[in-house]
């Protein structure tokens, strides 16, 4: 049944009349000057004329049938007379009007006031162009209600699942609004995640649809997809290369984990947790297993990864970071494969482009959002994201057809085992994966037991070399329990228990000596000695724990959802994050309040996410929900660790825009199916042929054994890393270090008397060591406001040269007051330091940079050679 021309045009112009009236009311409701400016009155007149003209055309369309038929026949061709150019031109007009109408006023400079006056009419024009597109769609497809019913019937499972998921989203929204779960600040509480800009989403969709439109070669044409493995290999490599180039060419900015650049080398050296991980990697480079010296290697696989990066790129931190970016840029390529398998190549491309854009925002916005983790930081969150994407891919390949030999189960177990040595949170995924597999296998419980057993076996194979090393060094294989006990239990759980004795000190992510205490937010950490969280009330002991776990878990979900655009305005990253001041979603004290625009957009985005989830359930059942379920499990693991938001959600927040993109492409596919002329035989349910057909490549045992061998060799590289390098620091005693200075004629150049040196050597508070210096930073607190935000334990009164020094038994922070920055101080230089030990650092009295031409630096002013100072 087609819509008749009078009804079609009458509806079109009637809706245009209502839209013009709404824009006119909005303009008149806004405050203006007393006399109403000429420009304002001109726009009022323009909207009034537009409204009256639309109303007149509405009446004309309904009252004069012949005129309506003549207009539709001339300007809106249908059937075989339809040509795509009108649709393309109107689509371009709509995009241009949207770009103009939603342009922020600050981008227009002195013309901003005139633009603000004209904006209501531009909004009307944008809506009118969108209506025209819909009219072209309606007349092209013919709008047969039987087709709509058939589509609903064929997509019944997907639509029902989508509505169920959307209902759960809305229920969660209601619970958050009533209980304030996810909005009540806690100790390790980061801001909302790194946002995607709406122009980036539109660009990603355009790339995806352009790829879908390249049907001339048959690779992307709906319903005619071919396996095209080589095509996928090419696309995979192109995405990898584009991501590596884009991220490496995005300028790095000052951030908490990579502050700077500071003289003398003007590099973004790592700090806080990133510094700990890199210093852990420096010990194997001098042939020392740090664990044998009493250190706890917090992230063993990631630190070992840095060992080999340094072995290839040297100690130039820029080269190391660039090489890391090249490797981690595989992440969007993995999302492409996952999207292609779950749905289609356009979904994979959309997810990959969004991933590239999001990390560009993270790199550029590190100063704006502060506690982020990016591929350009020596942090463990983004490598975990790569591991989680690969894990989701393998689990889907495993569970989409449980009749296969479990080669993918073995590979997935190995990946999860390796992930546990990057961060501890993935341990929580183990029971969730086993449970997902149980649902996937159904009544085939013997197959489930066998596959789960192989999964767990390869997991053990992956971690076995490091467990063996820990038994030899620390007497226990459970390398993760030390971090859980000290970092999580003592610093995060005990303070929440009303009757517990709270340990002194601040939470720290490392047990290494000299490690800096770094709360997750820039603001002061709230006092939680007797109150689990602000607003927790008189909760019982277990109630307090339940509250902060649920609170952080909810905050993780909220922060992840809000990475999608919440405004139609084409703001830049700075204005998105900081444009609304204290009302910004990224403000430290954001109370959960959303604007009407944000609510509408968020509801639309949640609907698309629900459609993506619903489609995956209808097509793949539990296997299609693997990314979603692992995301929820990881978010809950963060809640159990009492961490949330910001950098903590980086490993899994990609799942949000992944399902969002899947739902968006699926809607576009449905719309594209309606563009087929009446009578051409639409196949609404087969417009997508997922590139995951079962058939060849059922998986063989040799593939599983190969996966086991690979993960074992990766795991073995951890304890072996320190055996590939020799220890240059064979002298560890104070007298031995002074002997080196004397032999090189440097002892006399220090300017201290012999008896003073002898007395200083016997002083128990003295520090005389031969080691390697890293990350030299000259901090001038008068000229650099950000300098005060790092090294909180150092005095902030005078400029300092600060660097880290590792020796075979420990690493220390060296502080040397200096009037000006040294001209020469290379990173990873061998040095001899004389100083006085304090609680958190060494107060330097002399620093000697060794080499062919040794350089001596003394404090300004020069101090007596005695301790304490």
PLM regions and their residue ranges:
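Transmembrane-helix signature of polytopic, membrane-embedded enzymes
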Residues: 335-370, 386, 403, 620-629
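Extracytoplasmic catalytic/substrate-binding loops of multi-pass membrane glycan-assembly enzymes
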Residues: 249-280, 290-308, 314-318, 474-480
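Transmembrane-helix motifs of polytopic, lipid-linked glycan transferases
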Residues: 319-350, 390, 607-614
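Membrane-interface transmembrane helices that cradle and orient dolichyl/undecaprenyl
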Residues: 284, 383-408, 437
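Start-transfer (signal-anchor) and selected internal transmembrane alpha helices
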Residues: 1-22, 36-99, 113-179, 183, ...
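Perimembrane helix-loop-helix junctions
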Residues: 429-460, 468
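Membrane-interface alpha helices of multi-pass inner-membrane proteins
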Residues: 394, 408-423, 433-435, 458-462
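Lumenal/periplasmic acceptor-binding loop at the mouth of the active site in multi-pass
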Residues: 257, 262-266, 273, 495-611
């Amino acid at each position: 049944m087609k819509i008749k021309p009078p009804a079609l045009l009458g509806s079109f112009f009637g809706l245009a009349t209502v839209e013009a009236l709404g824009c006119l009311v909005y303009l008149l409701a806004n405050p203006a000057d007393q006399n109403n400016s000429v420009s304002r009155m001109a726009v009022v007149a323009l909207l009034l004329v537009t409204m009256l003209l639309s109303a007149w055309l509405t009446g004309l369309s309904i009252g004069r049938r012949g005129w309506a038929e003549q207009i539709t026949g001339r300007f809106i061709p249908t059937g075989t007379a339809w040509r795509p150019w009108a649709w393309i031109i109107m689509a371009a007009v709509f995009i241009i009007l949207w770009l103009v109408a939603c342009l922020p006023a600050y981008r227009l400079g002195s013309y901003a006031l005139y633009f603000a006056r004209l904006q209501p009419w531009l909004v009307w024009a944008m809506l009118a162009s969108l209506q025209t597109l819909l009219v072209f769609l309606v007349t092209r497809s013919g709008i047969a209600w039987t087709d709509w019913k058939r589509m609903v019937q064929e997509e019944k499972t997907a639509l029902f699942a989508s509505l169920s998921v959307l209902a759960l989203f809305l229920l969660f929204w209601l619970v958050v609004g009533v209980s304030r779960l996810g909005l009540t600040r806690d100790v390790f509480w980061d801001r909302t995640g790194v946002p995607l800009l709406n122009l980036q989403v539109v660009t990603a969709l355009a790339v995806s649809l352009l790829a879908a439109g390249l049907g001339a070669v048959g690779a992307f044409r709906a319903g005619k997809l071919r396996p095209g493995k080589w095509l996928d290999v090419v696309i995979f490599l192109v995405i990898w290369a584009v991501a590596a180039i884009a991220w490496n060419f995005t300028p790095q900015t000052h951030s908490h984990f990579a502050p700077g650049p500071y003289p003398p080398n003007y590099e973004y050296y790592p700090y806080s947790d990133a510094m700990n991980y890199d210093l852990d990697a420096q010990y194997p480079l001098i042939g020392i297993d740090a664990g044998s010296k009493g250190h706890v290697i917090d992230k063993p696989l990631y630190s070992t990864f840095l060992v080999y990066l340094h072995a290839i790129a040297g100690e130039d931190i820029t080269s190391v970071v660039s090489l890391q970016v090249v490797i981690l840029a595989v992440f969007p390529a993995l999302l492409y494969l996952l999207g292609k398998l779950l749905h289609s190549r356009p979904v994979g491309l959309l997810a990959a482009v969004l991933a590239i854009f999001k990390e560009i925002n993270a790199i550029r916005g590190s100063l704006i959002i502060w506690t982020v983790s990016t591929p350009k930081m020596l942090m463990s969150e983004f490598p975990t994201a790569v591991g989680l994407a690969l894990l989701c891919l393998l689990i889907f390949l495993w569970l989409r057809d449980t009749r296969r030999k479990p080669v993918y189960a073995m590979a997935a177990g190995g990946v999860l085992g390796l992930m546990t040595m990057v961060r501890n949170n993935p341990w929580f995924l183990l029971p969730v994966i086993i449970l997902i597999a149980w649902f996937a296998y159904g009544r085939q419980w013997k197959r489930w037991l066998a596959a789960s057993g192989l999964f767990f076996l390869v997991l053990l194979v992956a971690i076995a070399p490091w467990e063996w090393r820990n038994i030899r060094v620390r007497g226990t294989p459970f390398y993760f329990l030390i971090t859980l006990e000290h970092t999580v239990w003592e610093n995060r759980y005990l303070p929440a228990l009303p009757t517990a004795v709270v340990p002194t000190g601040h939470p720290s992510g490392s047990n290494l000596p000299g490690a800096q205490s770094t709360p997750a937010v820039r603001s002061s950490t709230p006092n939680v000695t007797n109150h689990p969280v602000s607003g927790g009330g008189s909760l019982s002991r277990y109630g307090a724990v339940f509250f902060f776990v649920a609170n952080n878990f909810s905050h993780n979900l909220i922060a992840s959802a809000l990475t999608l655009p919440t405004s139609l305005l084409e703001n830049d990253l700075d204005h998105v994050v900081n444009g609304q001041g204290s009302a910004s979603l990224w403000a430290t004290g954001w109370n959960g309040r959303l604007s009407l625009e944000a609510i509408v957009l968020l509801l639309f985005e949640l609907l698309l996410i629900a459609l993506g989830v619903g489609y995956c359930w209808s097509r793949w059942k539990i296997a299609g929900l693997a990314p979603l379920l692992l995301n929820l499990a990881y978010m809950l693991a963060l809640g159990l660790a009492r961490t949330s938001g910001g950098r903590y959600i980086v490993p899994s927040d990609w799942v949000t825009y992944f399902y969002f993109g899947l739902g968006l492409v699926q809607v576009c596919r449905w719309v594209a199916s309606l563009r087929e002329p009446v009578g051409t035989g639409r196949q609404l349910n087969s417009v997508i042929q997922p590139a995951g057909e079962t058939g060849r490549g059922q998986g063989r045992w040799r593939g599983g054994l190969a996966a086991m061998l690979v993960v074992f060799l990766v795991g073995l590289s951890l304890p072996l890393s320190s055996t590939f390098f020799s220890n240059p620091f064979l002298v560890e005693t104070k007298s031995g270090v002074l002997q080196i200075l004397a032999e090189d004629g440097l002892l006399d150049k220090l300017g201290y008397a012999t008896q003073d040196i002898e007395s200083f050597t016997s002083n128990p508070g003295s520090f005389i060591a031969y080691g390697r210096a890293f990350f030299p930073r000259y901090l001038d607190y008068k000229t650099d406001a950000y300098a005060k935000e790092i090294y909180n334990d150092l005095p902030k009164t005078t400029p300092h040269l600060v660097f880290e020094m590792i020796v075979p038994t420990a690493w220390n922070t060296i502080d040397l007051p200096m009037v000006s920055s040294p001209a020469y101080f290379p990173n990873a230089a061998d040095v001899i330091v004389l100083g006085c030990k304090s609680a958190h650092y060494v107060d330097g009295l002399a620093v000697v940079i060794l080499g062919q031409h040794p350089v001596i630096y003394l404090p300004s002013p020069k101090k007596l050679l005695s301790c304490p100072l």
